[in-house]
A protein has these predicted regions:
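Charge-rich amphipathic alpha-helical interaction elements
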Residues: 1-146
Length: 146
């Protein structure tokens, strides 16, 4: 075993690993943002449900203020739902990019594994040839001594 294994495409593998790590970070950020928007939407909907009940003890001014607040909440809910849709699309897109990056890295990883297995097989073959030669020389020496 004379040489150490060196993968010829190691720089490409490193590049693919960095790309995958970057895609993971982008995906996690997109997922975090989507979850934040979902929580915001849930809070707005809860607030809308809480204030949408009509109280007969309220004055006309209070009812008008409540009506304006509910309209504001409703428009904010609509805006937040649109933002949630765009965030869900972003999550789908970043997930697809992440899967592509993982596949690309795995392809190069498989190439490395196959190359390393071939290297080890060749090293073992060379070592076996050397062992056979040593055994042959030892046998010839023993035959010569007799």
């Amino acid at each position: 075993m004379g040489q150490t294994y060196k993968f010829k495409l190691q720089r490409l593998l490193d590049l693919r690993e960095k790309e995958e790590d970057g895609k993971k970070i982008v995906f996690m950020e997109a997922l975090r943002e989507k979850n934040r928007v979902e929580e915001e939407l849930k809070g707005l909907e809860d607030s809308f449900q809480r204030y949408s009940t009509v109280n007969n003890n309220m004055s006309v001014t209070e009812r008008k203020i409540q009506h304006h607040y509910l309209n504001l909440l409703n428009s904010t809910i609509d805006i937040t739902q649109e933002k949630l849709k765009t965030d869900e699309e972003r999550v789908k897109l970043t997930r697809k990019e992440l899967v592509t990056a993982q596949v690309n890295k795995k392809i190069v990883g498989i190439l490395k594994d196959k190359d390393q297995a071939a290297f080890i097989k060749e090293e073992n073959r060379i070592e076996q040839i050397q062992n056979d030669e040593f055994a042959l020389y030892g046998f010839i020496r023993e035959c010569g001594r007799r």
